Amino acid sequence: MKEQTEIEFYELEKVRFITKDACGLDIAYAYEDLVFAEHGLFIIQFPNEGGKVLNCWFNKDCIELNRVNMFNSLAKSATLNGMEISYNGKFEMIQKDGLEEIDIKFDDMN
């Protein structure tokens, strides 16, 4: 007998709306629990099972003032749409040599 795996459903459309409403940006890519904003400015990560707060990571190259303003807009829009978002730190995209793949290095604030 095969073991059934539970499928995790995320509120991608709500995150898409929050991102567009707050920053005027579209979603460039979504993979598993990660949602990448246009231009790689930030990543929103859906919480682990049972969690209620979205995690937000900004590109390490994003200017501090822009990061603060965008996060404040995201937090306000998330609240207005019944969600919460927390700033978790910065990330860096690293191109793998000779491959069309990237690694993502998260720099946690904790």
Where are these regions (language model features)?
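Alpha-helical scaffold elements within enzyme catalytic domains, especially in hydrolases
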Residues: 17-18, 77
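Short secondary-structure junctions
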Residues: 21-30, 81-90
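Terminal, regulation- and interaction-focused segments at domain boundaries
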Residues: 1-17, 58
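Short linear loop/turn motifs
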Residues: 29-38
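Long, continuous compositionally biased terminal/linker segments
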Residues: 37-81, 105-110
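A generic structural signal for short, non-catalytic loop/turn and secondary-structure boundary residues
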Residues: 20, 37, 49, 97-99
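Glycine-rich, aromatic-bearing surface loops/beta-hairpins
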Residues: 88-110
